[in-house]
């Protein structure tokens, strides 16, 4: 009888929820709206959801590829290399919103007069040629304390792709590494002279500050909503939910919620651009 009922639901287009939990892993950036959506779906639909951020975007892609989770979260597109590495996984990306990677500094750097950097200046810092903020227009001498995002995380890949054209072209560097967004913001806020890459929505303007990027025309472009939506800001990036094939069962319930009005409101609540802001 249960099998017949399940078949009827399936034929009617109603997602059939598995008794096993829906496991989700990946980006700490995408996690914010997803974790809140999961709370709502647990309460309203009794959906058993487990959300983790182990390994960031790279972890979400690899665990989905290995079949350890049913849903991955990623702040970078799935690459051809990822697809070749996991040939049994039919990566299906669902675009849920837009974000940007910002170069953030500690309060003392901001107060030292650093408000914008060019690509050439950032490359000089990353490659170790410039080590003091005064060389970049700071009012007083101050050592640059750079924290590098862990290679493989979506934030790092977007950053080095912009800086070098490809993650593979990025040089090996010897900076302290940071993982998730909370860790990055805490490290930068508590370290004099600090600089790192971070999701723009996490730059609170109190403890850490997002720098503008100086374009080829010499004009600074800040990671503000209109610049991210128009891609005038060069480090704009899409946010994805990933499934193996078309979303089904609990994964479809989650995806449908995130693409609906309530889910898109959560995307916006956490500082990201909802889809309607990209296609008004």
Where do the protein language model's features map onto the residues?
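Bacterial N-terminal signal peptides
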Residues: 2-15
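Exported/periplasmic ABC-transporter solute-binding proteins
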Residues: 18-87, 91-280
């Amino acid at each position: 009888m249960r099998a017949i009922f399940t078949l009827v639901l399936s034929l009617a287009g109603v997602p059939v929820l598995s008794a096993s939990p829906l496991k989700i892993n990946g980006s700490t950036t995408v996690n914010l709206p997803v974790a809140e959506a999961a709370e709502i779906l647990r309460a309203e639909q009794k959906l058993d959801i487990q959300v983790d951020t182990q390994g960031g975007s790279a972890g979400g892609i690899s665990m989905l590829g290995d079949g350890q989770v049913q849903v991955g979260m990623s702040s970078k597109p799935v690459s051809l290399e990822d697809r070749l590495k996991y040939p049994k996984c039919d990566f299906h990306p669902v675009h849920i919103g837009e974000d940007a990677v910002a170069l953030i500094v500690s309060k003392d750097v901001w107060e030292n007069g650093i408000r914008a950097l060019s690509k050439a200046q950032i490359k000089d810092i990353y490659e170790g040629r410039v080590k003091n903020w005064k060389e970049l227009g700071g009012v007083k001498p101050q050592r640059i304390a750079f924290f590098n995002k862990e290679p493989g995380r979506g934030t790092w890949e977007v950053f080095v792709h912009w800086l070098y054209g490809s993650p593979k072209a990025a040089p090996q560097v010897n900076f302290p590494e940071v993982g998730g967004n909370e860790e990055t913001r805490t490290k930068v806020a508590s370290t004099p002279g600090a600089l790192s890459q971070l999701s723009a929505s996490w730059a609170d303007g109190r403890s850490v500050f997002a720098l503008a990027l100086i374009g080829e025309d010499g004009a600074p472009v800040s990671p503000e909503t209109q610049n991210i939506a128009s891609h005038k800001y060069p480090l704009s990036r899409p946010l994805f939910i990933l499934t193996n094939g078309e979303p089904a069962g609990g994964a479809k319930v989650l995806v449908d919620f995130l693409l609906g009005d309530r889910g898109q409101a959560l995307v916006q609540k956490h500082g990201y651009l909802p889809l309607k802001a990209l296609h008004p």
